[in-house]
Amino acid sequence: MAKAKYERTKPHVNIGTIGHVDHGKTTLTAAITKTLYDRYQLGEAVDFANIDKAPEERERGITISTAHVEYETPNRHYAHVDCPGHADYVKNMITGAAQMDGAILVCSATDGPMPQTREHILLSRQVGVPYIVVFLNKCDMVDDEELLELVEMEVRDLLTEYDFPGDDTPIVRGSALMALEDPKSEWGDKIVELFEQIDEYIPAPERDTDKPFLMPVEDVFSITGRGTVATGRVERGVLKVQDEVELVGLTEAPRKVVVTGVEMFRKLLDQAQAGDNIGALLRGVQRNEIERGQVLAKTGSVKAHTKFTAEVYVLKKEEGGRHTPFFDGYRPQFYFRTTDVTGACKLPEGIEMVMPGDNVTMEVDLINSIVVEEGLRFSIREGGRTVASGVVATIIE
């Protein structure tokens, strides 16, 4: 078979393995790279040992071990993350260190769903992983068809419990270890089948430039005779000169403004797009009517809120976090995009306190309304140092 030439035109998808300890996440990751290389001569085979000794990274001051591998199918290019320990998964998913467009839930056919299977599904729901495909592993060790069906049913029920479409979720039965030992075998076929399902079931993500425009305001200054300039990095979408946008957050109601100029590196542009650091010249806005912490956004695309639920990871003392627990009613600063806002934490019923190193679902009530959306990452700070990292799960008001 002729070697497929690598083209950057393939859609790129971020994916990861989740599931209980020792159910075979890392073995599957290795088996995927080996099988896809063996079958299509695409990507490169990565050894189990290289994935298992994942390097430590620091994301928002938190130490996380994550292995990154890349591979491709005939249709797509994938970036895949695998974490060695359960704590790494929790941190990774909450900080968004490795964004996932979809996940492969690995569940051992010999054990069925276990506590971390449940916890990873819950985390996926909380942090906004949109799609899950299931790989039922170690099927070479189970002869009983009824047992396999029972485990499948349990996994589907668990997915449904956390608002994933359990009945429609693709489940592929296989053996990562057997596929790793012989990618040409029928077990290798199962890896190919898994990716046929993933290619079809997990859509390629919408590109940042296709989303509605949003730019957090970082700084504001006035240019005599020209007006007020707001600077910041365009988070998503495209901004064209003469667009009418809204200034949202920290005020009672959003305010419509017209962008009369877009400047980048002291050059004037017709338009700016996601990733650009720009200055936007705003017509008819006084210097004192706009401040850091507000956002410029496509009219009607976002709202400012004060109350939401969040999934939060509290830094350990060794990570520079608190040395003591905090309690219900704790009032730290919440750092969103470019600004700190004070807020109160309401802990779930039955949870008295939260220890450094814990993860917890909490309700947050901010003193000022700012633009927050489901899936938005934030830090919790005390006196300028980060003590926790979180992600918005649901908006309350």
Swiss-Prot record:
Keywords in alphabetical order: Cytoplasm, Elongation factor, GTP-binding, Hydrolase, Magnesium, Metal-binding, Nucleotide-binding, Protein biosynthesis
Keyword Ubl conjugation: no
Renumbered residue ranges of the record's region G5: 175-177
Superkingdom of the organism of origin: Bacteria
Domain tr-type G: residue ranges: 10-206
Compartments it resides in: Cytoplasm
UniProt region (G1), positions on chain: 19-26
G3: region residues: 82-85
Its EC number(s): 3.6.5.3
Described function: GTP hydrolase that promotes the GTP-dependent binding of aminoacyl-tRNA to the A-site of ribosomes during protein biosynthesis.
Similarity comment: family membership: Belongs to the TRAFAC class translation factor GTPase superfamily. Classic translation factor GTPase family. EF-Tu/EF-1A subfamily.
The protein's name: Elongation factor Tu
Gene behind this protein: tuf1
